[in-house]
Amino acid sequence: IVVALDPGHDSTHAGASANGVREEVLTLKIAQYCKAELEEYAGVSVYMTRTTADCPHPGGSSAHDIDQRVADAAAAGASVYVSFHLNSSLSSAAKGAEIIIPNTNWKPQVGNDGKKLATLIESELVGLGLEERKIYSKNTTVNERYEDGSLSDYFTVQISAKEHGIPGIIVEHAFVTNTSDVNNFLNNEAGLKKLGVADATGIAKYFGLSKGQWYKDSTGWWYASGTSYLKNQWAQISGSWYYFDFNGYMETGWQKVVISRWNR
């Protein structure tokens, strides 16, 4: 399973800022915490659209950058695309978490999958104490159309992800303009980590994953997840790759990997 995490904005395309916090800085931190938590689950590979403050596709518009980020994630085999953002409002009273999902006008299953994923993540965020806002889709306001003639989504994340056949969602974690959200979650590492872990937990529930555990006996180490254990396969655990033999024991030292060659 490949999960694409997209820290929204960057140093070129800055996001919202208020109360001493900046969106493009914090979205990267939240995504990094989410990545670390997701990698505690066996069989999950995380693709990050950016790992520094820099724009991954400089020299163009924000829409071009987003389109390329999604294309890169799809090329990496991503099954879902989760874009991390923070909200802002003219009203300092506005607070809480909301998530934007694909519409169901074209490739409706993508929209349905996006709603399922968003519902699970929103539930985890609300469980932290964030105010529950809405999960919604937004259609184009300039009559743009998908291939089937239906109205397209408004945001590039949803449009590009849908074109690649994967659900793209925008998670607006909290408001930079609300002092309660900022003090509880955004101006401290503990709060940012809670947000990232909540995102990861929702994603894991979407895929039906459970955390595994290492065990050791007289023969060696093995890794169990739920009622089953890994065997005869490679697995990425906590960001590192391991190979488990036919009996489920972790191999050590150099291993010979046979690669098939074919023509096309």
Summary of predicted features, one role per range:
Residues 209-264:
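Extracellular adhesion/carbohydrate-binding repeat motifs centered on closely spaced tryptophans
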Residues 13-14, 49, 257:
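A short alpha-helix capping/helix-coil boundary motif
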Residues 21, 25-210:
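Active-site-proximal helix/loop segments of hydrolytic enzymes
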Residues 2-4, 168, 244:
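Hydrophobic "anchor" residues on beta-strands that sit immediately upstream
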Residues 11, 176, 247-249:
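Acidic glycine-/aspartate-rich tracts in secreted/extracellular proteins
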Residues 7, 101-103, 173, 225-226, ...:
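Pocket-edge structural micro-motifs
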Residues 1-20:
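Short glycine-rich His-centered loop
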